[in-house]
């Protein structure tokens, strides 16, 4: 079970080959994703994002996927927007998503689902919910 939070971190080993001999470096790298909580901006746009930072070795190529999820009935989450980005800056980058904030009388709770793809490694996290006066269609 993944607990909601402000960020998530995962560590990984790295395998290298030298003259056909494979060696494994334990805890060779780590990646952290820090959520930029959904918020309503000018023009009724919901913006949301994920800051990614990786250290060590074995995390290239690096990319991330974020999903804006709208809560329904207190337990079901519908993905209403999704963004994927290759991060070419090295061990860091930012993925930003945007969705239209449609009118509603009561609003909805939103969260971000984030995934980091670091070489052959993968990490996942979810943000805490925020209530916004929106309905994303």
Please describe what each predicted stretch is.
Residues 88, 120-137:
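Short beta-strand elements
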Residues 1-41:
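N-terminal prepro-regions of secreted/extracellular proteins
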Residues 39-53:
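Contiguous beta-strand segments within globular domains
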Residues 54-62:
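A short beta-turn/strand-edge loop motif at beta-sheet boundaries
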Residues 102-128:
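Internal, hydrophobic beta-strand segments that form the core of beta-sheet-rich folds
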Residues 64-72:
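Conserved aromatic beta-strand anchor motif in extracellular beta-sandwich/beta-rich domains
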Residues 90-103:
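Exposed aromatic-hydrophobic patches
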Residues 78-92:
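Solvent-exposed serine/threonine-rich low-complexity stretches and specific carbohydrate-binding patches
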